[in-house]
Amino acid sequence: MKWLVLLGLVSISECIVKIPLRRVKTMRKTLSEKNMLNNFLKEHAYRLSQISFRGSNLTIHPLRNTKDLVYLGNITIGTPPQEFQVVSDTGSSDLWVPSDFCAIEACSLHTRFRHLQSSTFRPTNRTFSITYGCGTVKGVVVHDTVRIGDLVSTDQPFGLSTAEHVSRCTPFDGVLGLNYPSISFWSTIPIFDKLKNEGAISEPVFAFYLSKDGQEGSVVMFGGVDHRYYKGELNWVPLIPAGNWMVHMDRIYIERNVIACSAGCKAVVDTGAAFIEGPKSQVDNMQKFIGARPRGSKYYVPCSVVNTLPSIIFRINSINYPVPGRAYILKNHRGRCYTTFKENQWSPSTEIWILGDVFLRLYFSVFDRGHDRIGLARAV
């Protein structure tokens, strides 16, 4: 489409403001030294975040990758601004960060919002509770000015956690939800919708490029698409239904053998999920097909066979999206190679797959709120 090309050209222009990407120490070594790596890997499927580049029509935020599990970037809240590292999550809709009132250990390890230091802070009497795969976050709903790079949302509703019953090893301060308002836990307008409604972004789209192998360069961009981050054309997939980043998937197969989703199924494109998740029986079938053996909570293969493993092909809207062995196998701190397929415990009675970062590192993704669709193309 012409406007995609034009926006890509705009992003290259001198009007973009670039904020340097800061490398974050990998979580793998830190957690391994404390014998907490297994718990972290088991509990956390989140990932990503933002800093900023700015063009007249396109805002780009670099993301920092920690251990190939979470991508972190910065937002600021309050006046004067207080900075937080957050996970940008298309699987949820709400923004929350720790409150200065939160005295438990999980909060004390992160930056906490000091509301008394913000002249634009506005409290409410509403409370919230959000349940994630890693635990529960509880707190109060408040309002203040939130900045994502040069994008500014005044009087933005968000959550201040007063209790976080999650792992104390999470490398992020909070979560920036980018899903539809319909799944908001506290039924307030999410930040992307508020920016869209106020005309702060030129097009109601955002997109992700996730770098591979711990490299720098991951970005989330708002208001347009920079074509330099993908090859070929974007393949558009309608949502089913509008209101959640979920699409129809035709099937999953290996070497012409259908191994899952044989009658069609649903797939959530989730930047907040680290791995690829599906029904237990079908995930077990995939593990068996590639010769993976269980050990503890994971499945392992000999590292010597990774480059010979077959690609797993996800067919979406009549387009094949192969994921090769080198993408779906990761190596732990002991040099052992494990698969990145997990049971989706959230929908045991329905065949729903979650396409997380393992998939999205290969495919540039565009989330188009204006047309209720997702665009996918091979990432550069």
Curated annotation (Swiss-Prot):
Root EC class: hydrolase
Signal peptide residues on this chain, from the entry's feature table: 1-15
Disulfide bonds: C102-C107, C261-C265, C303-C337
Subcellular location: Secreted, Extracellular space
Keywords of the record: Aspartyl protease, Disulfide bond, Glycoprotein, Hydrolase, Protease, Secreted, Signal
Source species: Ovis aries
Propeptide: 16-53
EC number(s) reported in the record: 3.4.23.-
Alphabetized Pfam families for the sequence: A1_Propeptide, Asp
Glycosylation sites: N57, N74, N125
Domain (Peptidase A1) ranges: 71-377
The family this protein is said to belong to: Belongs to the peptidase A1 family.
UniProt-recorded name of the protein: Pregnancy-associated glycoprotein 6
A Gene Ontology biological process term: proteolysis
Tissue expression summary: Trophoblast and placental tissue. Produced specifically in the invasive binucleate cells of the placenta.
